[in-house]
Curated annotation (Swiss-Prot):
Subcellular localization, as worded in the UniProt entry: Plastid, Chloroplast
Gene Ontology cellular component list: chloroplast
Protein name per its UniProtKB record: Ribulose bisphosphate carboxylase small subunit
Role of this protein: RuBisCO catalyzes two reactions: the carboxylation of D-ribulose 1,5-bisphosphate, the primary event in carbon dioxide fixation, as well as the oxidative fragmentation of the pentose substrate in the photorespiration process. Both reactions occur simultaneously and in competition at the same active site. Although the small subunit is not catalytic it is essential for maximal activity.
Lineage of origin: Eukaryota, Rhodophyta, Bangiophyceae, Bangiales, Bangiaceae
Primary localization class, coarse: plastid
GO terms for biological process, alphabetical: reductive pentose-phosphate cycle
Length: 138
């Protein structure tokens, strides 16, 4: 099951050329970029691991592309994403986020149903990947 998180999640995976164009856009708008990775694909997992330091005041997209390449080499079977942060007063938020790397096999999720009083049903998601220990999921 394909993980759909981020700006381009319903499109085919971006090529390096397309990623570079998005990074050029990010840099041209004066946004800060950072690279994050995880092996826990749960939709509510918003705390991915930060790769290196955030790239503030970067003037060339190749610096961000270098960090993506380094992360891909070290974490080839992890989800890797780029975030663009706007520090403009009043915004101060992530304004763009997209996945740049995926594991070869994405096992998907188990939907768990629980019966509660009054015929109420509660649902939760469980990633099949998290059945293995952290660092050995893919």
């Amino acid at each position: 099951m394909r993980l759909t998180q981020g700006t381009f999640s319903f499109l085919p995976d971006l090529t390096d050329e397309q990623i570079s164009k998005q990074l050029t856009y990010i840099v041209s708008k004066g946004l800060s970029a950072n690279v994050e990775y995880t092996d826990d694909p749960h939709p509510r997992n918003s705390y991915w691991e930060l790769w290196g330091l955030p790239l503030f005041d970067v003037k060339d997209a190749s610096a961000v592309m270098y960090e993506i390449s380094s992360c891909r080499k070290a974490k080839p079977n992890y989800y890797i994403k780029v975030n663009a942060f706007d520090n403009t007063r009043g915004i101060e938020s992530c304004v763009m986020s997209f996945i740049v790397n995926r594991p070869i096999n994405e096992p998907g999720f188990l939907l768990q149903r629980q019966d509660f009083e009054g015929r109420t049903m509660k649902y939760s998601l469980h990633s099949y990947a998290t059945e293995k220990p952290e660092g050995a999921r893919y």
